[in-house]
Amino acid sequence: MRIYIWLILLNAPPIRTDIYLDLVRQGASPAYSKIRNDTFRTLATDPLFRRRVTENSLTRVLNAVAWKLNDAHEARVNGWQSPPTLSDFGDTPESAYQSRHSFATSARTDASTSEAEQVGYVQGMNVLAAPFLYAARSEVEAFVAFERLITRECPGYVRGSMDGVHKGLKLVDTVLEIVDPKLFAHLMSKGMHAEIYAFASVLTMCACTPPLPEVLQLWDFLFAYGPHLNILCIVAQLILIRDKIIDSPR
């Protein structure tokens, strides 16, 4: 039930299974070696995840998403009306028109986008995809939800420069300074900017922080009210352990 609620909250329409299978049949994407370097260690110490999700399943979903992002980038650069793996992507005629229009607009405005600004596979996407596979009843559902999240909700997180993540980290520092100036000053005195301790939490929307069942409940909240609220959740985690942080001799 959870995955269907997530799909609704993410406004992610279903797709035909054969569309996902076509992406899988394309074989190794340009990012495949990076994906394989990450998948084997994804939530490796979480027995619940390891029992339900196989490495091969995670690899297929990430590789399919990498192909879709690659084709979307080529569409922007070449000005295609509809990239090969995006056509008939389960959309209604109206949404398909909007998709084609957005690609045409992007082609006019973003054709000169540098490699650092391209949306593609980056390290950490494996952890971000993991809860979707854990909650989903099929790879297709996980693929649709994950792809929708990274392309519509937080595309800045998966650009080569990860500019969205770095902006989020600055927000963690800013919010913490407002909410708890003493804790913020203590961390700054130790040289502990959010870039050092909160990078993974921002990038993965706290999926890197066990236990997994609590991550799923957190995501229920984030998808309902906005993934940007993850910044406040990270600060809340710091507040919960503030005494331990301040009393720590290091």
Predicted regions and their residues:
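Internal, helix-rich recognition cores of eukaryotic regulatory domains
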Residues: 1-250
